[in-house]
Regions:
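Ribosome large-subunit tunnel/peptidyl-transferase-proximal elements
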Residues: 1-52, 56-66, 107-112
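C-terminal structural segments of small proteins and small subunits
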Residues: 78-107
Length: 112
């Protein structure tokens, strides 16, 4: 992996105890984004905190976050960093929505 911003995003997720972290290069599937990152956390509160950490990392790398969808009671928080879309789920929601299945024709890279 050569993308510094992606590395920084993945590192902040690892440092803050996200589980089951994967990423996909979606440029062939979605011309509006480069990477989708998906991870699992143990609580809604942890999800919101991680969303804020990801926002900070992207901002420090010159990426303006377009939107953070969700709040401290959400089971799924999406951080829209334009080229870097980060999906943060509590476990039950990740299973229920099964996002990885939607992109099953793309390589899914596991982290950690």
């Amino acid at each position: 992996m050569e993308d510094k911003i992606l590395k920084d995003v993945l590192q902040v997720l690892l440092d803050n105890k996200a589980d089951d972290i994967v990423y996909l290069n979606v440029t062939s599937f979605n011309p509006l984004a480069e990477f989708f990152v998906i991870c699992t956390v143990s609580s809604n509160r942890q999800a919101m905190a991680l969303a804020n950490y990801v926002d900070d990392v992207l901002s420090k790398n010159g990426i303006k976050v377009k939107h953070i969808e969700g709040n401290s009671t959400s089971e799924w928080i999406l951080v829209d960093g334009i080229d870097y879309i980060v999906h943060i789920f509590v476990k039950e929601a990740r299973i229920r929505y099964g996002l990885e299945k939607m992109w099953s024709d793309l390589p899914i890279i596991k982290v950690g």
